[in-house]
């Protein structure tokens, strides 16, 4: 933007008032503001304005502002009316983001609203739990940190190419905290694995021929010789045998992922855990 345009740039002060976190109001206002790339917007958020006294403090702070748009999500009618009255008296624009929706639903259903502060925020908690589960899955992928096994809702074990990582992420999307461990020949199994409730451990296996083809294709994709120890049938059989011995020792639930989609395997895991659909 040129200096001349900067000097002539219009400025709007966006005042966001909410009796909860204020994310709903902020997102809606921002969605409108981005339609005006040449306008400078100054955002001021006032969350948790839950009574008239707090609201009056906001009014005192913004009373001298110019070019103001007040956007509010206030459940109680007296605070709504106070915000509207203040805006009109000070020649400020305003938008009530909740009342219209609530009134129309009441008109259609005859039901009375419960006037619960922060109801949208509570509803969104499931979303934040899911994000937390996704972060957990990434943090404890491939056995990066053994302590994750003790904190997880599910622990996936399996040799290479048994869908551990995609399964972890799929289950995380169901709000499950998942850690996984690749079973590599001649490597130490972390002590934490033996401390996990066997019901939480899922042993993944595969058909040798399927695993052979998957690994060969993986090597080809990397531009490498497909005939290596990694894809050798004898090596694959030895890996699977070692994995099955570990599963038997742990007493864990075993799933053969051959010819199964991620969704199908995840459904079996959730059924085993007694979960219908964790992400509700």
Curated annotation (Swiss-Prot):
> What sort of enzyme, by top EC class, is this?
transferase
Q: Which reaction does it catalyse?
A: N(tele)-phospho-L-histidyl/L-threonyl-[pyruvate, phosphate dikinase] + ADP = N(tele)-phospho-L-histidyl/O-phospho-L-threonyl-[pyruvate, phosphate dikinase] + AMP + H(+); N(tele)-phospho-L-histidyl/O-phospho-L-threonyl-[pyruvate, phosphate dikinase] + phosphate + H(+) = N(tele)-phospho-L-histidyl/L-threonyl-[pyruvate, phosphate dikinase] + diphosphate
Annotated ADP binding lies at: 158-165
Q: Which cysteines are joined by disulfide bonds?
A: none
Superkingdom of origin organism:
Bacteria
Metal-binding in keyword set: no
Reply yes or no: does the keyword Nucleotide-binding apply.
Answer: yes
| Keyword entries, A-Z | Kinase, Nucleotide-binding, Serine/threonine-protein kinase, Transferase
- Enzyme nomenclature, EC number: 2.7.11.32, 2.7.4.27
Q: InterPro entries from the xrefs? A: Kinase-pyrophosphorylase, P-loop_NTPase, PPDK_reg
What GO molecular functions are on record for this protein? ADP binding; ATP binding; phosphotransferase activity, phosphate group as acceptor; protein serine/threonine kinase activity
Matching entries from Pfam families are given as: Kinase-PPPase (PF03618)
Its annotated function is as follows:
Bifunctional serine/threonine kinase and phosphorylase involved in the regulation of the pyruvate, phosphate dikinase (PPDK) by catalyzing its phosphorylation/dephosphorylation.
Can you tell me which family this protein belongs to?
Answer: Belongs to the pyruvate, phosphate/water dikinase regulatory protein family. PDRP subfamily.
Supply the name of the protein: Putative pyruvate, phosphate dikinase regulatory protein
Taxonomic source organism = Lactobacillus gasseri (strain ATCC 33323 / DSM 20243 / BCRC 14619 / CIP 102991 / JCM 1131 / KCTC 3163 / NCIMB 11718 / NCTC 13722 / AM63)
């Amino acid at each position: 933007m040129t200096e001349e345009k900067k000097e002539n740039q219009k400025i709007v002060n966006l005042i966001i008032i909410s009796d909860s976190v204020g994310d709903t109001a902020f997102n809606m206002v921002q969605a409108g503001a981005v339609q005006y790339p040449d306008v400078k917007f100054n955002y001021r958020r006032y969350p948790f304005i839950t009574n008239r006294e707090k609201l009056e403090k906001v009014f005192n702070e913004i009373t001298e502002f110019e070019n103001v748009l007040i956007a509010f999500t206030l459940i109680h009618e007296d605070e709504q009316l106070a915000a509207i009255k203040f805006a009109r008296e000070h020649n400020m624009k305003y938008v009530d983001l909740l009342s219209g929706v609530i009134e129309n639903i009441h008109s259609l259903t005859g039901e009375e609203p419960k006037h619960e502060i922060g109801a949208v925020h509570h509803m969104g908690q499931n979303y934040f739990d899911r994000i937390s589960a996704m972060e957990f899955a990434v943090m404890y992928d491939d056995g990066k940190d053994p302590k994750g096994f003790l904190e997880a809702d599910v622990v996936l074990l399996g040799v290479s190419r048994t869908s551990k990582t995609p399964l972890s992420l799929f289950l995380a999307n169901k709000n499950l905290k998942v850690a996984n461990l690749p079973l590599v020949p001649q490597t130490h199994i972390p002590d934490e694995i033996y401390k996990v409730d066997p019901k939480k451990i899922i042993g993944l296996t595969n058909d040798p021929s399927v695993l052979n083809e998957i690994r060969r294709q993986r090597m080809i994709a990397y531009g490498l010789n497909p005939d290596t120890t990694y894809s050798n049938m004898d090596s694959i059989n030895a890996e699977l045998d070692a994995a099955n011995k570990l599963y038997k020792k742990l007493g864990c639930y075993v799933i053969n992922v051959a010819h199964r989609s991620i969704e199908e395997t995840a459904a079996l895991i959730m059924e085993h855990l007694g979960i219908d659909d964790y992400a509700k």
